[in-house]
């Protein structure tokens, strides 16, 4: 599978023979902790720590006593408003009989300023209704204390969930649009991950209260800031990974390879998970989008959903209905729960059922962080092929024709880590480089040019212009672990604990490897340099079933294969971004 996506070379100058192993056998075998721009590594706390923060930390919001009270508000009404601020209860009705427009306006202003937006006013026929929080009729009007920064940043910790699904689910519960939830990037699904997220004008208490509603997701660590989280603005990710079922005689060989890996790094390929494992790859869908063949792109997305578990209410069931009938409204009605609003297919069916065009489905119905993945996948495929050609023709050392991140020739003190290759698209600094030339040749085979991407930049977040050819795995650590049972937990998870060190013994051998990568680099590609094996999802799943036999599939693998209401997979690739 790797070779069809351009992953053909290695950074090591020695021939690498494959070492069989199992990756992501248990969710906690693959832990991803986002590293912020200031190099803070986001923690994955114990369930107790998360639950203690749930709804227990109150907003640091107090009554603004200095706000002048209008003469039209009585002391009795003021006392009722103060009481309502302190405790939730029935709304307070402020009578406005015979009051002027300016007086009524002053009441709204007074309540908003004195109670920092916690109390909400609504104009009714018999007066002004004041309630604690948003009522159904006022929930779209979000009053906010201007002295409080409008962006609430918080950490999401999730297990076996797509980032896109988790964000859309949180958006639904918070009653905000999915594009209002911002992240630095998308994290792996079959893993335990932590990442920073932001949402506009939502109180900390409201966010923490979600912990009672979410399964396999925890939110915590709220902080108000002026600006939202920006895509790609973090430093990278910290990985803690377990490779299981290693051959008994592989320990010395892997130790030697890890020492080499520490010095040479690895080729910065885009991993196979970027391209998916369905009948139509995400790169093929991306190619259709770049060609503006919107109908083909939509139909490929929907066809990809059909191999899933076809139980009633599932995405696969609805996709099959749409394929057979062409009736988007009928197909959309087959979805249940979060499948209707937190999946790409659900968004598409909803758009079509309301009269949207094929283009609307791609450019509007699918959230930007999700739709961008398709075009990025096509760019990634082209980049991988060019990177392989570069290593095959010039080796791993700096060559005179190499260029750096600015498109200029490299100096005499440059290392292989300084080599950059452009991504497809108009890129003036790299014009004339071998990278730009080879990319144009590959695009021409698909009927495209570099300018084909220009009009897509804004709608598909095509910001990155180049990518380093080699990457160093920083703060590398490793240790070998013995264990006795194939399902022994060897790392702490979101709600599980690893077996004690005293019990880490037995006939089975595993490698725990930890390292930090810059944003956009793939841990599975780094592991490939060590194991010499295809570390992609399909290859690892096949290896897992072969090792234990179809009758011994773990519960996690069975759920992964069938699909589950709790997982609600988006059928998109995940990126170690």
Swiss-Prot record:
GO molecular function: pseudouridine synthase activity; RNA binding; tRNA pseudouridine synthase activity
Protein name according to UniProt: Putative pseudouridine synthase B0024.11
Amino acid composition bias (Basic and acidic residues), ranges on this chain: 538-565
Reactions accelerated catalytically: a uridine in tRNA = a pseudouridine in tRNA
Active site: 188 (nucleophile)
Residue ranges occupied by any TRUD domain in the UniProt entry: 265-472
Native source species: Caenorhabditis elegans
SUPFAM superfamilies cross-referenced by the UniProt entry: Pseudouridine synthase
């Amino acid at each position: 599978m790797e070779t069809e996506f351009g992953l053909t070379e290695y950074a090591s100058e020695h021939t690498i023979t494959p070492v069989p192993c199992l990756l992501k056998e248990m969710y906690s075998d693959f832990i991803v902790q986002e590293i912020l721009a200031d190099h803070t590594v986001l923690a994955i706390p114990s369930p107790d720590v998360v639950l203690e923060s749930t709804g227990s930390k109150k907003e640091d919001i107090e009554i603004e006593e200095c706000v002048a009270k209008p003469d039209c508000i009585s002391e009795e009404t003021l006392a009722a408003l103060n009481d309502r601020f302190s405790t939730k209860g029935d709304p307070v009705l402020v009578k406005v009989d015979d009051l002027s427009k300016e007086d009524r306006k002053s009441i709204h202003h007074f309540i908003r300023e004195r109670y920092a937006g916690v109390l909400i006013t609504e104009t009714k026929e018999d007066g002004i209704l004041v309630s604690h929080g948003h009522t159904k009729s006022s929930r779209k009007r979000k009053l906010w204390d201007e002295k409080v920064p409008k962006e609430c940043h918080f950490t999401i910790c999730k297990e076996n969930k797509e980032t896109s699904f988790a964000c859309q689910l949180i958006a639904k519960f918070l009653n905000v649009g999915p594009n209002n939830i911002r992240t630095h990037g998308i994290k792996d699904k079959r893993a335990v991950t932590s990442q920073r997220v932001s949402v506009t004008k939502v109180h900390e208490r409201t966010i923490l209260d979600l912990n009672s509603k979410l399964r396999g997701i925890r939110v915590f660590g709220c902080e108000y800031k002026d600006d939202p989280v920006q895509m790609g603005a973090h430093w990278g990710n910290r990985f803690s990974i377990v490779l299981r079922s290693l051959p008994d005689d592989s320990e010395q060989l892997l130790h030697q390879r890890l020492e080499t890996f520490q010095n040479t790094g690895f080729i910065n390929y885009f991993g196979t998970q970027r391209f998916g494992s369905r009948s139509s790859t995400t790169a093929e869908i991306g190619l259709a989008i770049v060609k503006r063949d919107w109908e083909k792109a939509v139909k490929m997305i929907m066809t990809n959903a059909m191999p899933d578990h076809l139980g009633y209410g599932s995405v696969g069931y609805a996709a099959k209905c749409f394929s057979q009938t062409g009736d988007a409204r009928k197909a959309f009605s087959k979805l249940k729960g979060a499948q209707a609003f937190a999946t790409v297919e659900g968004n598409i069916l909803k758009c079509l059922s309301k009269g949207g065009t094929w283009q609307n489905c791609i450019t509007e119905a699918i959230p930007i962080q999700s739709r961008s993945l398709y075009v990025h996948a096509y760019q990634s495929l082209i980049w991988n092929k060019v990177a392989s050609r570069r290593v095959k023709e010039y080796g791993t050392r700096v060559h005179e024709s190499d260029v750096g991140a600015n498109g200029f020739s490299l100096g005499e003190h440059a290392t292989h880590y300084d080599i950059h290759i452009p991504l497809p698209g108009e890129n003036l600094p790299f014009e004339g480089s071998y990278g730009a030339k080879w990319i144009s040749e590959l695009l021409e085979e698909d009927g495209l040019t570099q300018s084909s991407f220009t009009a897509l930049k804004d709608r598909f977040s095509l910001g990155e212009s180049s990518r380093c050819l080699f990457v160093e795995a920083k703060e590398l650590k490793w240790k070998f672990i013995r264990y006795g049972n194939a399902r022994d937990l060897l790392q702490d998870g979101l709600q599980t604990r690893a077996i004690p060190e005293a019990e880490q013994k037995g006939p089975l051998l595993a490698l725990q490897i930890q390292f930090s990568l810059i944003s956009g680099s793939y841990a599975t590609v780094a592991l490939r340099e060590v194991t010499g094996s295809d570390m992609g999802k399909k290859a690892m799943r096949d290896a897992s079933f072969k090792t234990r036999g179809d009758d011994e599939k773990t519960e996690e693998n069975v759920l992964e294969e069938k699909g589950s209401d709790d997982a609600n997979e988006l059928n998109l690739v995940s990126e170690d971004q």
